[in-house]
């Protein structure tokens, strides 16, 4: 497989961008080697500058649920572009997308469009603090909610300790208001509430974790978090930036029967264009400016092209489309598990809907600690062998792979065939 042009571009990029990229995971740091520079995409495939063709399971980290360059999405975006790229004023397209969101998630009584998932989650945290008059928030170890300072915090030495910054540049005075607990561990969360309940404004979680690889919620966990929030007067924030409109027409909330106080969106609702949103209970959202005193604003919020892309994509995601996604995803997961067994490589294929991760572990993976115990060296060998055989997976053991309605049975068969060869390579690594 030729990579000369990607290598040359990466050399230039390293002179222009930190680490040669504009988002860290793209640099292949977790797997080694040179990232592929992508020149175009169509359907379920992407093509790099050297002419290599890959079945794409990154899908721009989730947004491309109907595949790349879907004609209906392209048409609606092109129509919007002809009308103007940004107005700095209300536009009809905001209402079209918002009505579609509320039709599928009626508990989102009011919402605010923003320009990224990070902006959505940091805004939701501010709203929760303003609404409750409390300062502390709780997140779960391994859950990623964007790059905002309050959320770049990992677990301390115990569930009752204050948060510690997970990045230089995050002040300790900010991080101390972020408390942490292990995902899937309700007793640990109960202890956090026992210690700090009167000061906790909200609990935020990924209902299905995607940023430690796919971690599946244990039965009763998500509702248990909701019940603890109710008991202690904290808001329940469900971060659906990754899962929203991907796992079902009602997102993870619809799939698991959740009714959060606030929910955040991104990715799929922009179909590849920059977008985010937060919304929820009417009484909470009515505290947001200009209706209320909690300030939030954005120059490009409700961008008409992003609204058009999201509207077109959501219209395409019918119940039949979700059934197709489920069948394809199940076939891929089963094929990967079987291929690993043939090579005598122990793996755990965690999947919910069209999100999945192949964990190189002989034990169940259900929280950050069990994910971190995986064999990342084997994953690296597997990743590069898959890449060599035309399957583009996330370049990290700790990320989710995605499928789209553009994927086909042939794509899945090609990927499983590549996996048989790739697991054989992984088996050579200790």
UniProtKB/Swiss-Prot annotation:
Predominant localisation class: cytoplasm
Enzyme class: isomerase
UniProt KW keywords: Cytoplasm, Isomerase, Porphyrin biosynthesis, Pyridoxal phosphate
Annotated localization: Cytoplasm
Enzyme Commission designation: 5.4.3.8
Record GO terms (molecular function): glutamate-1-semialdehyde 2,1-aminomutase activity; pyridoxal phosphate binding; transaminase activity
Gene Ontology biological-process entries: protoporphyrinogen IX biosynthetic process
GO cellular component: cytoplasm
Residues in coiled coil: none
SUPFAM superfamilies to which the protein is assigned, alphabetical: PLP-dependent transferases
Keyword Transmembrane helix annotated: no
Location of N6-(pyridoxal phosphate)lysine modifications: 267
Required co-factors: pyridoxal 5'-phosphate
InterPro entries cross-referenced by the UniProt entry: 4pyrrol_synth_GluAld_NH2Trfase, Aminotrans_3, Aminotrans_3_PPA_site, PyrdxlP-dep_Trfase, PyrdxlP-dep_Trfase_major, PyrdxlP-dep_Trfase_small
Reactions performed catalytically: (S)-4-amino-5-oxopentanoate = 5-aminolevulinate
Annotated metabolic or biological route of this protein: Porphyrin-containing compound metabolism; protoporphyrin-IX biosynthesis; 5-aminolevulinate from L-glutamyl-tRNA(Glu): step 2/2
Pfam families attached to this UniProt entry: Aminotran_3
Subunit details: Homodimer.
HAMAP family listed in its UniProt record: HemL_aminotrans_3
PANTHER family found in the cross-reference section: GLUTAMATE-1-SEMIALDEHYDE 2,1-AMINOMUTASE, GLUTAMATE-1-SEMIALDEHYDE 2,1-AMINOMUTASE 1, CHLOROPLASTIC-RELATED
Similarity field: Belongs to the class-III pyridoxal-phosphate-dependent aminotransferase family. HemL subfamily.
Protein name stated in the entry: Glutamate-1-semialdehyde 2,1-aminomutase
Organism: Anaeromyxobacter dehalogenans (strain 2CP-1 / ATCC BAA-258)
């Amino acid at each position: 497989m030729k990579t000369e042009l990607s290598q040359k571009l990466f050399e230039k990029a390293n002179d222009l961008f930190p680490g040669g990229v504009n988002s860290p995971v793209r640099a292949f740091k977790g797997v080694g080697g040179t990232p592929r520079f992508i020149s175009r995409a169509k359907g379920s495939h992407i093509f790099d500058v050297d002419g290599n063709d890959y079945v794409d399971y990154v899908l721009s980290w989730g947004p491309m649920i109907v595949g790349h360059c879907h004609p209906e999405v392209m048409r609606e975006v092109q129509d919007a572009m002809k009308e103007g790229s940004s107005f700095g004023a209300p536009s009809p397209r905001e209402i079209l997308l918002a009505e579609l969101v509320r039709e599928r998630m009626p508990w989102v009584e009011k919402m605010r469009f923003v320009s990224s998932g990070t902006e959505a989650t940091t805004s939701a945290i501010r709203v929760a603090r303003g609404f409750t008059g409390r300062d502390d928030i709780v997140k779960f170890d391994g859950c990623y909610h964007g790059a905002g300072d309050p959320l770049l915090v990992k677990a301390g030495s115990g569930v009752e300790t204050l948060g510690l910054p997970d990045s230089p540049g995050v002040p300790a005075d900010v991080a101390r208001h972020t408390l942490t607990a292990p995902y899937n561990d309700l007793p640990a969360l109960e202890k956090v509430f026992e210690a700090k309940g009167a000061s906790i404004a909200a609990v935020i979680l990924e209902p299905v974790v995607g940023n430690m690889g796919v971690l599946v919620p244990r039965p009763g966990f998500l509702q248990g978090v909701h019940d603890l929030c109710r008991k202690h007067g904290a808001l329940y924030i469900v971060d659906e930036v990754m899962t929203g409109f991907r796992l079902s027409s009602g997102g993870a909330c619809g799939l698991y029967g959740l009714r959060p106080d606030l929910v955040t969106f991104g990715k799929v609702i922009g179909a590849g264009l920059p977008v985010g949103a937060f919304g929820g209970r009417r009484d909470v959202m009515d505290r947001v400016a200009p209706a209320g005193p909690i300030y939030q604003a954005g120059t490009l919020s409700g961008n008409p092209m992003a609204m058009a892309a999201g509207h077109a994509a959501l219209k395409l995601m019918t119940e039949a489309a979700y059934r197709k996604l489920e069948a394809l995803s199940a076939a891929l997961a089963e094929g990967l598990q079987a291929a690993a067994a043939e090579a005598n490589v122990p793996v755990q294929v965690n999947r919910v809907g069209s999100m999945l991760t192949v964990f190189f572990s002989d034990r169940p993976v259900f929280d950050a600690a069990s994910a971190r115990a995986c064999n990342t060296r084997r994953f690296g060998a597997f990743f590069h062998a898959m890449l060599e055989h035309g399957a583009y997976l996330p370049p990290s053991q700790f990320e989710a792979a995605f499928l789209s309605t553009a994927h086909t049975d042939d794509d899945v068969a090609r990927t499983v065939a590549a996996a048989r060869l790739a697991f054989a390579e992984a088996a050579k690594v200790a």
